[in-house]
Amino acid sequence: MAVGTAGFTAMLAVMALEDHGLVRGHGPVLVTGAAGGVGSVAVALLAALGHEVAAVTGRPETEAYLRGLGATQIVPRADLAETVKRPLEAETWAGCVDAVGGAMLARVLGQMKYGASVAAVGLAGGASLPATVIPFLLRGVNLLGIDSVMQPFDNRQRAWARIARDLPLDKLEAMISPATLADLPGLGRDILQGQIKGRVLVDVNA
């Protein structure tokens, strides 16, 4: 249960990037919201598959955690938080798993390499997308929507098989914070304040 919907979604995102041409050695893959549930699994999966992973976080104290999952570069959230001023920036990222949306996603689109793809999995930073179509028209960037609810059965089987094969168990264990039902009110407050990292595994029998 520690993998959960977040881990399943992360695997779907990685598969979508692969289906749209992501291969090892073409440059770093960006993961926004990297210390969260989806982001943590995405970092671990991409690193295990041999990709150079750049992890975006607004919490400096999570750097050691993210590097332990396999991130090779830590990108401060502030570096990508400003709204788009130029529709295109230097081509930097070979792929991206984005859990943030909003202004950060708009900024990332302008930094993608030619023909690269962004898998959008969340909207922690907002549902609006203050971007231009220039990255799509001049660099052939792909924006891929990831839905974990209505996936066909065969794709679900494929994703879970990939999780079993590609997600290192030691990395999964490093993401888990055990909790009980009595801990839930405090955990709720921590979630709203952005203080939770990785996955919380609630023992309903404790």
Where are these regions (language model features)?
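A glycine-rich, Thr/Ser-enriched phosphate-binding loop motif common to dinucleotide/cofactor-binding enzymes
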Residues: M1-E18, A35
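Glycine-rich NAD(P) Rossmann-fold beta1-alpha1 loop
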Residues: G7, G33-S40, G101-G102
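Short helix-loop-beta connector
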Residues: L17-P28
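Residues at the starts of beta-strands that form the adenosine-phosphate
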Residues: P28, H51-V53, S117, N142
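Conserved hydrophobic beta-strands of the Rossmann-like cofactor-binding core
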Residues: P28-V31, C96-V97
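Adenosine-nucleotide cofactor-binding segment
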Residues: A47-A103
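Glycine-rich phosphate-binding loop and adjacent beta-alpha segment
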Residues: A103-L169, V204-A206
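C-terminal hydrophobic helical "lid"/dimerization subdomain
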Residues: Q157-A206
